[in-house]
Structure formats: structure tokens, C-alpha cells
Amino acid sequence: MNGWANYETWNAALWIGNDEFLYNTAKACVTYREGLETPWDKFVRCMMEGEIGAFLGATGDGVRWDDPAIDADEMNEMLWDL
């Protein structure tokens, strides 16, 4: 799908690339990840836990950030390039 592994990966990348809050959060996840945590793991954790997770646990199209169909390697590559 448009060069991405599948719809879920494409959709997550699309939302991160086109929403200012998600974009800035993703950039922060690259900088502030902990230990061996990947940027994508940090982003998913930030988006799924606490108050944010209650409201932003999925893209605007309903794809959950922790959807196992999302290709983590592709998402990490995209996040490193932000």
C-alpha cells in the first residue's frame, strides 16, 4: 500500500506525518526513549497509556497504535527520519 507493508502501517505513518501533535510526539519519542527502547515502542507506549491513551489510542481512522499488523521496523525507520 503506497510503498508500506500494509494498510495499518501506512495509516499510522500517514497520521503521524500529517498531524502536528502526533508528529511532535513522535519526534520526542526518538529523543526521549529509554534504554534499548525503540522510537516506535516509545511512541506506542506514550499513545496507549494514561490520559492520552483514553483519547488517542488509535488513528483518526480507527487503527490502534498497538495493532500487531503495524510493521514496527518500517515505523522505526520512518521515526528516525523525522
Residue ranges and their predicted role:
Residues 1-82:
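Acidic interaction surfaces
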